[in-house]
Amino acid sequence: WVKQRCGQDTKIVLLGVSMGAVSVMNALKYTDDVDYVVEDCGFIRVSQGLPFVYRSMVHIPNPFLMPVVKKRAKKYGFDMLDNNPIDVVKNSKVPICVVHGDMDRAVSVECAKELGTVMKNPKSRVEIYEGRDHAYSICDKERYTRMLSDFLDEMFVFPVEQEEEHGK
């Protein structure tokens, strides 16, 4: 849709935070049109994400949650083990910028580090923000903006005649 509306040479960048980060990683499974991804504090396995979502809604841990969810999912033909963002990232060559706070209490910073070990594009990177909790990396506005700008500037190469138009 984007390329039809804006032109085939349009670059598509997806940015997602938390569950949105999971969505942008999984989007890579369904289209080859995505050019770059910025993933901020997403979990890499469904088994990590569902307990977080449950706790955020109910505020108490439930040891019975995963077995019940797995059984219901299977009834509808969905295998949670087949829907892990890390597996999508392993099979993608798209440049990905992974962002995570090292004090994240919802999704372990280890998820970001593990993503860093499986990303195939040499322009991919992992940015860890010290002292930041879940989805709070953006509170370091200057660094976050610079990080996004640097990542995207590295990806977008404008022809010489467009440099003035884009402020280069």
Protein language model features and the residues they cover:
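Short beta-strand/loop motif that positions the catalytic acidic residue
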Residues: 91-93, 98-100, 104
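Short alpha-helix in the alpha/beta-hydrolase fold that links the catalytic acid
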Residues: 85, 94, 108-117
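Hydrolase active-site cap/lid region
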Residues: 26-78
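Catalytic histidine-centered segment of alpha/beta-hydrolase-like enzymes
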Residues: 132-145
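Conserved acidic catalytic loop of the alpha/beta-hydrolase fold
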Residues: 1-10
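Gly/Ala-rich beta-loop-alpha elbow adjacent to hydrolase catalytic centers
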Residues: 16-20
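Catalytic histidine neighborhood in serine/cysteine hydrolases
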Residues: 116-135
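Acidic catalytic loop of the alpha/beta-hydrolase fold
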Residues: 103-107, 134-135
